[in-house]
Amino acid sequence: MSSSAGKDKEPKVSSGTKEREKEAKAVGPVKESKDKDLKSKVKDAKEGKRDPVGAQAGVAFSLDNTIKRANPASGMRKKASNAEVIKELSKCREENSTRLDLAKKSIHMLPVSIKDLTQITELYLYGNKLQSLPAEVGNLVNLVKLALSENSLTSLPDSLDNLKKLCMLDLRHNKLREIPPVVYRLSSLTTLFLRFNRITAVEKDLKMLPKLTMLSIRENKIKHLPAEIGELCNLITLDVAHNQLEHLPKEIGNCTQITNLDLQHNELLDLPDTIGNLSSLSRLGLRYNRLSAVPRSLSKCSELDELNLENNNISTLPEGLLSSLVKVNSLTLARNCFQSYPVGGPSQFSSIYSLNMEHNRINKIPFGIFSRAKVLSKLNMKDNQLTSLPLDFGTWTSMVELNLATNQLTKIPEDVSGLVSIEVLILSNNLLKKLPHGIGNLRKLRELDLEENKLESLPNEIAYLKDLQKLVLTNNQLTTLPRGIGHLTNLTHLGLGENLLTHLPEEIGTLENLEELYLNDNPNLHSLPFELALCSKLSIMSIENCPLSHLPPQIVAGGPSFIIQFLKMQGPYRAMV
């Protein structure tokens, strides 16, 4: 069994299985109706004739080699000439329009005649090639919205401080290395977008924008925020994600109207205690920082409905924190340093719908920890150090998705039968030797992943999983399959690669919806049942490294449709050809 060595490292994929599946999927479906020579090739194979191409056994490829030529680019907007832009300006003036849309016209320079359009309140210039704005834009004193995103602006003219009514300024995706000084003088601004520039600092003059409700400066290179941000008392959304912040000023606690605070993907080492003053906060993004703790005062943010602390250095939470956050329904503590569940007892999970504890160092799920978690539907414990499951495991009746992959589980309790709502069960990369008979009670199960365990057989009760669509048994020690597998008529994906199978049961022919079948690397599999020919939807089949001597190389090279046709002609189903 493999395990993650580094913090961001995913568990290894066994023996190239995932790569094989990727290659096989590239083949795509092969339609028998499109291949006029298919029957003759099968006939040649029966007579012992060799394919002149000399294709290797186990190599799948598409028979439909038609090259679809790309259509010439259509619908692209032509570069607007200066005359066309002037024409648009004239039309706007003549019609006395208050809205001018010059977006995506490949404009390099705005005509100075724009100064005459003093009536407009909205000007859209996004998606052009502007490197600067003419000072004459400052004449547009009635502007309320100015959209300049997706240009190449490096500065703004000082004349813009005449725009006393401007409420929304969009400067996303430009080449600004600083917030243009004139921006701080636009005191009527309520919305300011500066995302994806090259800004390194926010100046103290930010306090001159007291009406701001929305400030987005994400995806820049900002290392600190000024204390003056605390004077933005009307701020509702503050997005500073994807920057280089190590600390937040304590004055952030003065912004008590904030409901959405996004700080993810920074270098934050701590949070100020004053964050507890943000009593209206409903969304707090802290994932991918360097936090080793969160302040106890966070418990005052009782409106939080989502808390994501993924990929920090946190090993514990303040006792009672989660119990106080009664509206949190999604909690992500993945990729941290937890060695045990947070202290606080069952009440801390009473409102949780989704809990993600992936990639920590937890070796035990405490008995009764979810006794009050009546709405818990998704639990991700992947990549921890679990060796067993709690005795009350069978009481998790509301669980819909359960991921226990990459642990050290040696068995699944028989009372797994109590998980009557479960639809997705991931148990890959463990040490399981067998499955409990109770698995057959999971009647809603759609996906069951048991890859890379030590299974030697499957219980007959697996036949009761009538809704199962994906069954992954890759890299185990299976020698046979139960005949009841034929009852899984909704199955579309069946992974059996890297086992010790000696044969497939003829009941596999009843899997009428099967689309993907992986049999690769079964060294004892010498033949395929004729009944496989009945799987008419089969489009991906991986059989490399199987000694299937009864299949001629040219048939194997032809892909699933060739193999199915060959099996039909060889067996009792030739009348279907």
Swiss-Prot record:
Pfam families in UniProt: LRR_14, LRR_8
SUPFAM superfamilies on file: L domain-like
Positions of LRR repeats: 96-118, 119-140, 142-164, 165-186, 188-209, 211-232, 234-255, 257-278, 280-302, 303-324, 327-348, 351-372, 375-395, 398-419, 421-443, 444-465, 467-489, 490-511, 513-535, 537-558
Subcellular location: Cytoplasm; Nucleus
One BP term from GO: positive regulation of Ras protein signal transduction
Signal peptide, first to last residue: none
SMART domains xref list: LRR_BAC, LRR_SD22, LRR_TYP
Ranges in a coiled coil: none
Record's keyword terms, sorted: Cytoplasm, Leucine-rich repeat, Nucleus, Repeat
Region (Disordered): 1-53
GO cellular component: cytoplasm; nucleus; protein phosphatase type 1 complex
Start-end of Basic and acidic residues biased regions: 1-52
GO MF term list: protein phosphatase binding
Family from the record: Belongs to the SHOC2 family.
Entry function: Core component of the SHOC2-MRAS-PP1c (SMP) holophosphatase complex that regulates activation of the MAPK pathway. Acts as a scaffolding protein in the SMP complex. The SMP complex specifically dephosphorylates the inhibitory phosphorylation Raf kinases, stimulating their kinase activities. The SMP complex enhances the dephosphorylation activity and substrate specificity of PP1c.
Protein name: Leucine-rich repeat protein SHOC-2
Gene name for this UniProt entry: shoc2
